[in-house]
Curated annotation (Swiss-Prot):
A GO molecular function held by the record: rRNA (pseudouridine-N3-)-methyltransferase activity
InterPro entries, sorted: Alpha/beta_knot_MTases, RlmH-like, tRNA_m1G_MTases_N
Any one Pfam family match given in the protein's UniProt record, by short name: SPOUT_MTase
Catalytic class of the enzyme: transferase
Catalytic activity, as annotated: pseudouridine(1915) in 23S rRNA + S-adenosyl-L-methionine = N(3)-methylpseudouridine(1915) in 23S rRNA + S-adenosyl-L-homocysteine + H(+)
Protein name: Ribosomal RNA large subunit methyltransferase H
Gene Ontology CC entries for this record: cytoplasm
Organism: Rhizobium meliloti (strain 1021) (Ensifer meliloti)
Keywords: Cytoplasm, Methyltransferase, rRNA processing, S-adenosyl-L-methionine, Transferase
Subcellular location: Cytoplasm
Sites where the protein binds S-adenosyl-L-methionine: L76, G108, L127, G128, K129, M130, T131, W132
Gene: rlmH
Family according to the record: Belongs to the RNA methyltransferase RlmH family.
Length: 160
């Protein structure tokens, strides 16, 4: 299964981008052994619309353009379901085994995600009850993707 990461906003050069890149590289190298590969990272500019609803709608339009036909969609949202690392790995394994070729994991903008995306999503997850800056969310999901691959492959990186 090809996994893409969609993010509203761009990571500037610096330690956050380096760390996210390091985990995505690890995922890209280890993932094929368990049938997961990094397809792409899509960054889109934040909408400059005057109100939050319009911004969310415009950002959702950018995500829809980035989705492959028939792609699965997982949203990262504060109102989503919290999973531990092993449950996240199981979810990725289940989605991989669904027969779908593509999965997009989406990080919304500062205003959140459009309700239409929630209706279309195959899963909505959160990374805990705390609010995280988007730069750190990228690092966290990149690390969790790598960790999921190590769990699925039985690698000792994850020591529960």
């Amino acid at each position: 299964m090809r996994i893409g990461l969609f993010a509203v906003g761009r990571l500037k050069a610096g330690p956050e981008k380096d760390l996210a890149g390091r985990y995505l590289d690890r995922f890209a190298k280890a993932g094929p052994a368990v049938g997961l590969e990094l397809a792409r990272v899509v960054e889109t500019a934040e909408s400059r619309a005057a109100n939050a609803e319009t911004r969310k709608r415009e950002e959702a339009g950018q995500l829809e353009k980035a989705l492959a036909d028939g792609s699965l969609l997982v949203l990262l949202d504060e109102r989503g379901k919290a999973l531990d690392s092993e449950a996240f790995a199981r979810l990725l394994g289940t989605l991989r085994d669904s027969g779908k070729r593509d999965l997009m994991i989406a990080i919304g903008g500062a205003d959140g995600l459009d309700p239409a995306l929630h209706a279309r999503a195959d899963a909505v997850l959160n990374l805990g009850k705390m609010t995280w800056p988007h730069q750190l969310v990228r690092i966290l999901i990149a690390e969790q993707l790598y960790r999921a691959v190590t769990i699925l492959s039985g690698h000792p990186y994850h020591r529960a």
